[in-house]
């Protein structure tokens, strides 16, 4: 059994349609200045006809497989982190498994909202370390724009759609996940949620008329919890890894809001020059935001072989997760 699970392949996929702040000005009472000042977002990608969680995930997964130099038949496990599956069941990971041709792979979904990538990275790494898996395709994807009330300017300006994927394989040298800290607070579940569509509140015409199928959030409370928990779990993950913040080459945070990212960086005493930000172009892509940012950071050579990176995220649930990874590709 291997001690580590290296990321040997990576890829991303986003919808073709770009929705700018100027476009939103024609949909809801808002302005480019208002959105950028409060969020840092300029534009986001929005899924169109024929673009689903599965299709974006398959595209990102294929890119990751190509980068890893693996055939889909070599994948033994497919994991999808999402809270916006194609259907309530079966698992969308099964659709991905069939779509990429990984016929022999086990497949399952994992739900941890915007923290999903870091949660899933821990699960995939644990499977490889235990010997339960060798070649894992791990995808994080969300299509939140299908759960948005486009008349609610407090939420419709925030979200975008996308997918990010990594291939994980056994490694004897320190690689991939070095430390990980996960957390949750179910008592705060109502701070951000979609009410209708589950077993508690099955979707009915009455609930749909009330708009209960759309995401809602308490932005002020989410901000406070996010900064506190992302910073605390980040510092703990760095400590467990036996490092200091100065050893971290790049922080790759969940891309929810620029103010949250900046406030978290201040608590870590890490300059923004060492924090990767791309939410201005994609908005909040939920579980996909960290892997999309990671892929772009690698492509822009912000991460090099041997570097330590900090991944940190926060989402509905409430959930939060931070991890130190060592990049060896």
Curated annotation (Swiss-Prot):
Its main location: cytoplasm. The keyword Lipid biosynthesis applies. Gene3D superfamilies: 3.40.47.10. CDD domains: KAS_III. It is an enzyme of class 2 (transferase). Belongs to the thiolase-like superfamily. FabH family. HAMAP family: FabH. This is Beta-ketoacyl-[acyl-carrier-protein] synthase III. The gene is fabH.
